[in-house]
């Protein structure tokens, strides 16, 4: 029993450190959306996430639905007290290809509409100064990204949440395939005991992980 309690205390301590060392800022409200290549203020619609542009034309098995490029943009302005912190963008899912820009500067591209991804924005955002975040999402058919075909429609959009993660310079890595950065492996189980291996990925600006 003492071993079990100590293990639970250790696990709780790890997650407490992880939570206290980061701030999560939801970005689900206040987006401007439009179809097409250029994101212009004219013709844009206000939307909140989660969002898909195929909510109407992709229903009831309709195969003649829009598959192409769309733009999501919104303003960002972090408090000045976050100066010196690291800033990450986490996208829950974007169907199918997503390109991220800050103030028209390319940040990253993610392929695959069913997995989350994280991009570091530290070099692109200055706390106290307004920035424009743009995510271009494209659900056009492509032969190198699954699913290539199926008996279902590929609904384009940012159909899960988006958030900023603010951390210290040294942190539990949020950008390792958008995971928690903490991994548990069960190495031994008997009637008398169970052994867990706990690995924590740490990241600093000099050794940032991508994924």
Describe each region flagged by the PLM.
Residues 26-29, 94, 209-210:
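A short, compositionally biased
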Residues 34-36, 67-175, 179-181, 205:
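Accessory beta-strand-rich segments of carbohydrate-active enzymes
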Residues 182-191:
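Short beta-strand segments of immunoglobulin-like
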Residues 1-4:
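Positively charged n-region of N-terminal signal peptides that target proteins for export
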Residues 7-16:
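Bacterial N-terminal signal peptides
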Residues 20-59, 132, 136, 142, ...:
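Accessory carbohydrate-binding/adhesion or oligomerization-edge regions at the termini
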Residues 102, 191-211:
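Beta-strand-rich binding/interaction modules
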């Amino acid at each position: 029993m003492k071993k079990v309690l100590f293990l639970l205390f250790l696990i709780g301590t790890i997650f407490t450190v992880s939570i206290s060392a980061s701030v999560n800022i939801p970005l689900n409200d206040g987006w401007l959306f439009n179809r097409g290549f250029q994101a212009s203020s004219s013709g844009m619609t206000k939307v909140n996430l989660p969002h898909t542009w195929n909510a109407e034309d992709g229903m009831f098995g309709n195969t003649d639905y829009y598959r192409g490029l769309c733009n999501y943009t919104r303003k960002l302005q972090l408090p000045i007290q976050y100066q010196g912190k690291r800033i990450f963008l986490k996208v829950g899912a974007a169907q199918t290809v997503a390109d991220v820009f800050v103030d028209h500067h390319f940040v990253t591209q993610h392929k695959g509409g069913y997995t989350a991804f994280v991009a570091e924005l530290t070099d692109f955002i200055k706390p106290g100064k307004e920035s424009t975040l743009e995510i271009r999402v494209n659900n056009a058919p492509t032969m190198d990204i699954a699913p290539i075909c199926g008996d279902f429609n590929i609904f384009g959009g940012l159909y899960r949440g988006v958030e900023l993660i603010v951390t210290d310079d040294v942190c539990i890595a949020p950008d390792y395939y958008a995971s928690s950065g903490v991994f548990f492996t069960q190495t031994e189980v008997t009637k008398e005991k169970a052994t867990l291996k706990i690995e924590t990925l740490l990241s600093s600006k000099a050794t940032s992980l991508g994924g």
